[in-house]
């Protein structure tokens, strides 16, 4: 109903023959409002992703405390950011985005646990999962939101 109202309210008046085409097109694009939310959340996501080199240094130095601080501090809101993005993606993309977000959150939790246990080999393995998780999830963000 919301899409019909926004289509009907937009000038010029739409004839009944063009309305089904407009509805079909609306289902395949992200609304400007949703794209604005995605853009804001994607910016936060990319800021966390940009801290991967810092996290890698902490992992390589076996800096248990600051590894955990980075995960629990600046990277902590990632779950919420990905949730907000996923809710506004096209319906056909949401399941895969949810899967990739869950994998990244799990990898971060496992990295945090490896640092807590001071397990160096596990820390290195989990960092690799975190880095690939960031890359995999970033592919779900529409290019328009990153420009």
Model-derived features with residue positions:
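N-terminal plastid-targeting presequences
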Residues: 1-147
